[in-house]
A protein has these predicted regions:
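Glycine-/small-residue-enriched transmembrane alpha-helix faces in small-molecule transporters
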Residues: 1-42, 88, 151-178, 300-301
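Hydrophobic alpha-helical transmembrane segments of multi-pass integral membrane proteins
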Residues: 7-12, 37-57, 72-77, 132-135, ...
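Hydrophobic/small/kink-forming positions within alpha-helical transmembrane segments
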Residues: 18-21, 25, 79, 83-87, ...
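Specific transmembrane alpha-helical segments of multi-pass solute transporters/efflux pumps
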Residues: 19-23, 59-100, 142, 225-243
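Structural motif at transmembrane-helix junctions in multi-pass transporters
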Residues: 32-38, 87-106, 183-186, 235-254
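Membrane-interface helix-cap regions at the ends of transmembrane helices
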Residues: 33, 48-68, 138-153, 196-217, ...
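Alpha-helical transmembrane segments of compact multi-pass small-molecule transporters, enriched
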Residues: 46-50, 105-119, 195-202, 251-266, ...
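Hydrophobic transmembrane alpha-helices of multi-pass small-molecule transport proteins
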Residues: 116, 128-147, 253-254, 262, ...
Length: 301
């Protein structure tokens, strides 16, 4: 049976949501007992193995020979952006007690992508997008606000890492979308993992961190590395290859619900009622932004 491109896109988008959601769970479990540099060494080390095996098995690794100097420059830029974004992401995972909160706050990413699209790609806004942005910002404020007399103590610790991560991921997403057809999802995923592994290896070496792990974090890393550096990245790039980014974002916004369930089952943790409300507002905002982008695209056709 041959699947059309739209069906393939939805399949990869759902696969990406499942894999991404579980990354929050297994990385949180591993980081509870591992230094972030050592964690990265093993996480991306295993991820590199899975990516190389997949690229070799499918024959996609041969595509490297067709890349030109400009392609390698794009991969370098993406690699540096991913190093920054991923480092801040795992700092947030380690710092914020409940991974579901990180997932909900991560819905700020579509706002960043939309704003970057306005300034870099000269894209336009419409009413659903504006309302969506406001809902996400309101949701993020509700989730992260904890009160206090000083601005520095008003928000939960770790919220700033999610913002930094979103900025770098947003820039990476725009560049990746413009180059995914040329570079292919497999090569982009492989390149990303190589950059992150080399960075983690260097961090362990320069910071004199431990080279070994106990069995509990190692087991969670093995599972998570299949879902994260391998399955999440490849399926995510495949999804934007076949679908509009707006449709992928709508499906991706549901990951917070999956993480919420997973965090409760795995850690016995559940967000406060106001944080859950903020999370639902942010999900609604992502959906509105995505719908707005799709409406704009239909008007152009």
């Amino acid at each position: 049976m041959t699947l059309n491109n739209t069906t393939k896109g939805y399949f990869f988008a759902f696969l990406s949501v499942f894999a991404t959601s579980n990354v929050y769970i297994f990385s949180k479990a591993a980081l509870s007992q591992a230094d972030i540099a050592t964690f990265g060494l093993y996480w991306f080390g295993f991820g590199l193995i899975w990516n190389v095996l997949f690229a070799t098995k499918t024959g996609k690794i041969k595509h490297i020979q067709t890349l030109n100097q400009n392609n390698f420059l794009i991969l370098l830029i993406l690699g540096l952006l991913e190093i920054a974004g991923t480092t801040f992401f795992f700092m947030a995972i380690r710092t914020v007690p409940n991974p579901a909160i990180v997932s909900f706050l991560g819905n700020i990413n579509p706002v960043i992508v939309t704003l970057l699209g306005l300034f870099i790609l000269k894209e336009r806004y419409n009413k659903p997008e504006v309302i969506g942005i406001l809902l996400i910002l309101l949701g993020a404020f509700i989730i992260s606000f904890k009160g206090g007399a000083k601005f520095s103590s008003m928000f939960i610790t770790g919220a700033e890492y999610i913002m930094y991560s979103g900025l770098f991921y947003g820039a990476s997403a725009i560049i990746a979308k413009k180059n995914v057809q040329k570079l292919t999802p497999t090569i982009m995923a492989l390149s990303r993992t190589i950059f992150l592994f080399v960075f983690s290896f260097s961090a362990v070496l320069l910071l004199s961190r431990s080279w070994t792990l106990d069995w509990f974090p190692l087991w969670n890393i093995i599972i998570g590395s299949v879902l994260g550096p391998f399955l999440t990245v490849i399926s995510g790039y495949q999804a934007i290859k076949y679908l509009e980014v707006g449709r992928v974002s709508i499906l991706g916004s549901t990951k917070g619900i999956v993480v919420l369930i997973g965090a409760y089952v795995y850690f016995g943790k559940f967000p406060e009622t106001y944080q859950l409300l903020g999370g639902l507002l942010s999900i609604s905002g992502v959906i509105l932004i995505s719908v707005g982008k799709l409406l704009l695209k239909k008007k152009k056709v």
